[in-house]
């Protein structure tokens, strides 16, 4: 298999009960891309993975089947299985520090308090991987963060959340076609 231009991995929790939650926005972005690119995701170890082409670039899409806080196991496993250079990985996550409707793409960085990203960094042994954060807002009472991230967007938030997911999909495609700098210039 030729080396892909990008393997985009959307973090979230497995199971229908989490499908439409804020915490699963990474999965939702991958679902949108798989539909747009007609890429079917197949079970492989502890992830769903699919491969296809965008323009003239090979692109991979994946969603871990592990819970968010154990996402690093799946990400590290995929990287090892496909012998991918770290700069070919893009991890997509929810971010409660960003307003609903916004995205932020970075080539490296901290976990920002996100347990899924922290576990990915731990298992990869580095923070030098690209990440795409999709804003979910933080409109919750003190001590209710878990309830907030594990609930769906409100009716008022849905249009902005949908727009952010579409922007995130476009950012992934821009990164696959061009590079992360082009995607950051367009979407940050």
Curated annotation (Swiss-Prot):
The alphabetical list of record keywords is: Cytoplasm, Hydrolase, RNA-binding, tRNA-binding
- Report the enzyme's class at the first EC level: hydrolase
**Catalytic center residues:** 23
Q: Which domain of life is it from?
A: Bacteria
GO-annotated biological processes: protein quality control for misfolded or incompletely synthesized proteins; rescue of stalled ribosome
Q: Name one Pfam family in it.
A: Pept_tRNA_hydro
Q: Which cellular compartments is it found in?
A: Cytoplasm
InterPro entries given in the database record: Pept_tRNA_hydro, Pept_tRNA_hydro_CS, Pept_tRNA_hydro_sf
Principal location: cytoplasm
Under the heading Gene3D superfamilies, the entry gives: Peptidyl-tRNA hydrolase
Q: Where does tRNA bind?
A: 18, 67, 69, 115
GO molecular-function terms, A-Z: peptidyl-tRNA hydrolase activity; tRNA binding
Q: Which GO terms describe its cellular component?
A: cytoplasm
Which EC number(s) does UniProt give?
A: 3.1.1.29
Which residues bear the site annotation Stabilizes the basic form of H active site to accept a proton? 94
Assembly information from the UniProt record: Monomer.
This protein is called what? Answer: Peptidyl-tRNA hydrolase
Q: Which organism is it from?
A: Salinibacter ruber (strain DSM 13855 / M31)
Which gene name does the record give? pth
């Amino acid at each position: 298999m030729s080396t892909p231009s990008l393997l985009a991995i959307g973090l979230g929790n497995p199971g229908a009960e989490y499908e439409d939650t804020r915490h699963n926005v990474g999965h939702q972005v991958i679902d949108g891309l798989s539909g747009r690119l007609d890429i079917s995701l197949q079970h492989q170890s502890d992830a769903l993975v699919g491969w296809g082409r965008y323009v003239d670039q090979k692109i991979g899409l994946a969603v871990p089947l592990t819970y968010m806080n154990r996402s690093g196991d799946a990400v590290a496993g995929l990287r090892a299985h496909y012998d991918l250079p770290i700069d070919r990985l893009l991890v997509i996550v929810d971010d409660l520090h960003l307003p609903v409707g916004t995205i932020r793409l970075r080539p490296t960085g901290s976990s920002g308090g996100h347990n899924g990203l922290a576990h990915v960094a731990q298992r990869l042994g580095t923070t030098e991987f690209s990440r795409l954060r999709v804003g979910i807002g933080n409109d919750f009472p003190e001590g209710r963060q878990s309830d907030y991230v594990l609930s769906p967007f409100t009716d008022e938030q849905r249009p902005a959340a949908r727009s952010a997911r579409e922007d995130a999909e476009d950012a992934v495609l821009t990164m696959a076609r061009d590079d992360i700098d082009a995607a950051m210039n367009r979407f940050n």
